[in-house]
Amino acid sequence: MDNSGFSWGPSISDLANDPVYGGNVQNEYTKGGLHNGQYYVPQRAAAGLDPWATPQAYNNAKDFFQTGVTWSNSVNVAQSFDKGNYSFSLGNTTSDGIVRSTGMDRYNVKLSGEAQLHDNWTTGFNGNFVTSKIKKQGTANDGVTATVYTAPISYTMAGIPSHIEGDPYTQNTFRENWIDDGNWACDNNSFTERSQRFFGNAFLKYSTKFGTDNHKLDVKYQIGDDAYTTNYSDIYGYGTTGYTNGYASEYGFTVNEMNSLLTFTYNWNINEDFVFDALLGNELVDKRISNTQAVGYSFNFPGWNHLNNASVFNSSHEYKRKRTVGNFASLSLAWKNMLYLNVTGRNDIVSSMPRDNRSFFYPSVSLGWVFTEVEALKNDILTFGKIRGSYAEVGMAGEYVPSYYYTPGYGGGFFQGTPIMYPINGNMAYIPYFVVYDPNLKPQNTKSYELGADLTFLNGLVSLNYTYSRQNVKDQIFEVPLAGSTGASSMMMNGGKMHSNVHEITLGISPVDTKNFKLDFAFNFSKIDNYVDELAPGVESIMLGGFVTPQVRAGIGDKFPVIYGVGYKRDGEGRIVVNEKGIPEAGETQVIGKVSPDFRLGFNTNIELYKFRLAAVFDWKQGGQMYSGTAGETNFYGTSKLSGEVRKSDKYHFDYAAVEQKGVDADGKPIYVPYTGGVKGSDAEEYFKSVRGIDEAYVYDNSFLKLRELSLSYPVYKKDNLNVNVNVFARNIIVWSEIKGFDPEATQGNNNMAGAFERFSLPGTSSYGFGVNVNF
């Protein structure tokens, strides 16, 4: 049994005969006598238990995870009067996660009201307050699942304490010096998020018809605010891997966004054929962000995980303010409920861009024709038909930050930790920030072209909608790498052009609609293809996130985004090159996967039979790829199903492989011939240790078909003003995917990496529940 974490060790059936730990043979641990049929477990000895165990298989994942439970409760009160109304709601959601010490508590309150002060004057408001506390555990390399997934099945995490006897701060784990034991992490590490948020608005509206029925003017002023504070507390307890003496971080954001909106809305029924609408408006958005952070390392003594116990301490504060002023207008003209023309324009002035590029204008125009309003085209089959087209521009400001100085932190080149932090002996240090901003930075611009049709057949029996759109994006704002000689690592600049082709189709069918039986279906199809056309001069691709390898990148000519990493070595015919044992060789760093799917198709149905209502939602994603770090690590450590199968097989091989022969051909190139052998079970460990360095080996097709939700509801009581409904539901109960055991939509990293990577993710879950709704 090898505690280094880098050897598979013997099979369960051979543990008792292991030359180092086996109880059937003479070794260091059997000097006092043999322990037939058993083997010595150092971790049991360290925990003060009987060190001898009978070999057997354990299910560490089953022992570690628990059944998550969520409770949701809400109450809503609403009432209407002759000249007003109000509503009040209160809700609470409490959940326990599938990992102990994780969960959420959330409370929300909403109050709204509206009153007619006069024939021409109306006022109203709505306010929402939400407070939540979320308890989490780490993911990826810091994840609690890392040891759960990589511990050999002969080792019981549940049966062996996670710390040595008498010392709760020294871990007792099979994979020491790499990652925290999952149970130890749940007991000693914590990641807490506390949030409070208020958002709402109030308005005053004046309406007049000028004494006629053909004109109407609404003048409305609305002021709103969205303010929230989120505080995070990250604790790595004394004895954690990487931060041996502990780590504490307290950081938080306070965001306040005020919105002032003034609109003038005018409606004019010119005559029986023409209707004119106009909208003029002004919007002011003022956003303030305050960010504070305090970090402490190396606790003076264990047992008190607090910043005040840190021997190395650092803190920082950041404040940002952004203001946007927008003026906009919209003009619409309708003719005979048949032709609709709309023209809009908006000009924004932002404070977050360089002074010369703060103002930008973006217009739009759209035209729609309801051709079934033409008398000659009216019929009982196609009861509604509309063709539409539009052109629009959208401007999006970036964030320009003048050069500034910051206090650096220097790592020691090892996993986790920042051992050198200022102040040092009371002295601070400041250096220029490593990202610089182009002083000519300008807003990103998107031009969109759209064509579509909306069709309804047989008075709503069938509905069909299709939309094609093309988006051309220019002046994208990217962080472009710079040469080290510049004194900076990268520059934020306008560095790209992209285009997107989008196809969307919705189909609705309602074949049955009777008093006691209703049936309807709906399909939603979407195909979105994004391509990178240009980047900054001299830049072929940009890293969006990831590791040294693999990475998520945006590359010229590639579908956005792509997975970039070490691929298989291939010959001129595209065959994977293997050695004489059938073990593949590493090739060049290249594009090894495309993240975006070919298409998505959603399907939902509702069936009402008497008072029962059954609903189902399916989702099909076709295409797209994901890198699975979990698969790579569990194969490497020999704990995956595949590694067990290869270990037992006589000939595991690639269907399309080649092996290099001695010598070269007439052109001086290597000679490759088809490989017909395979990896022997005895070489399985060598095989998986080799392919660990080939990222392409763990890029999987990310297609899936999900039964997202199945629900059944029934009104059990209805009398006078009292209605009682009950419902049951199941979510994610069926998933077909090449990636087994995990949710194919699991993802880690920033938004640019969404759907591209997973590493030590939590297992996929299904949920079952019931609900009771009472209305009176």
Tell me the role of every PLM-derived stretch.
Residues 1-100, 138-141, 185-192, 200-207, ...:
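Residues embedded in well-ordered regular secondary structure
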Residues 41-53, 61, 426-434, 472-497, ...:
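Surface-exposed, extracytoplasmic segments of Gram-negative outer-membrane nutrient-acquisition systems
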Residues 53, 603, 774:
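Aromatic-residue-lined binding/catalytic grooves and analogous aromatic/hydrophobic interfacial grooves
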Residues 92, 127, 618-620, 711:
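A mature extracytoplasmic/lumenal domain signature
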Residues 94-96, 349-351, 511-513, 597, ...:
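A generic structural motif
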Residues 106, 112-121, 126-131, 139-235, ...:
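Extracellular/periplasmic, surface-exposed regions of secreted and cell-surface proteins
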Residues 236-240:
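Short, conserved phosphate-binding/catalytic loop or strand-edge motifs used
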